[in-house]
Amino acid sequence: MIIGVGIDVAEIERFGAALERTPQLADRLFVGSELTLPSGERRGIASLAARFAAKEALAKALGAPGGLLWSDAEVWVEESGQPRLRVSGTVAARAAELGVRGWHVSLSHDAGVASAVVIAEG
C-alpha cells in the first residue's frame, strides 16, 4: 500500500551557489558518504542537488512534518545504480508512525535541474 508520494526539483546552479555561499550547509544537509564517491573524490553538484531533492521529496512523502533532520536520511546507490534511502532518528520515527516499510526512489538531473521522486510504501 502506498502511504505517501513526494516529488521535488532543485535548480543545480542555484543549489551550487548556496553551497558556495554557506560552506557548512553541505555538512547540515548530507552525511559524509553522500558527499564523496567511493574513490574518495567529492561528489558533483548535480548529484548533490539530486540527493537534496530526494530528501525534500522524502519529507513530502511523510506529510512534510516539522522537526525532521536532514542528517537522518541518507541517499545511497547500489552497485546496480539503483538509489536507496537509509533513514534513522526523526525520519525513522515518522516513517514508523505512518507504517512505512519500504521506499522507492528515483533521481535525475538534466538541463540544469535535479529531480527526485520518493514513494513510501507500507
Curated annotation (Swiss-Prot):
GO cellular component terms attached to this protein's record: cytoplasm
Main localization category: cytoplasm
Binding site for Mg(2+): 8, 56
Enzyme kind, highest EC tier: transferase
Cofactor names: Mg(2+)
Entry's EC annotation: 2.7.8.7
Source domain of life: Bacteria
Gene Ontology terms describing biological process: fatty acid biosynthetic process
Pfam families assigned to the protein according to its UniProt record, in alphabetical order: ACPS (PF01648)
Cystine residue pairs: none
UniProt catalytic activity: apo-[ACP] + CoA = holo-[ACP] + adenosine 3',5'-bisphosphate + H(+)
Compartment annotation: Cytoplasm
Single Gene Ontology MF annotation: magnesium ion binding
UniProt KW keywords: Cytoplasm, Fatty acid biosynthesis, Fatty acid metabolism, Lipid biosynthesis, Lipid metabolism, Magnesium, Metal-binding, Transferase
Protein's job: Transfers the 4'-phosphopantetheine moiety from coenzyme A to a Ser of acyl-carrier-protein.
Family in the record: Belongs to the P-Pant transferase superfamily. AcpS family.
Annotated protein name in UniProt: Holo-[acyl-carrier-protein] synthase
The organism of origin for this protein: Streptomyces griseus subsp. griseus (strain JCM 4626 / CBS 651.72 / NBRC 13350 / KCC S-0626 / ISP 5235)
Upper classification of the organism: Bacteria, Bacillati, Actinomycetota, Actinomycetes, Kitasatosporales
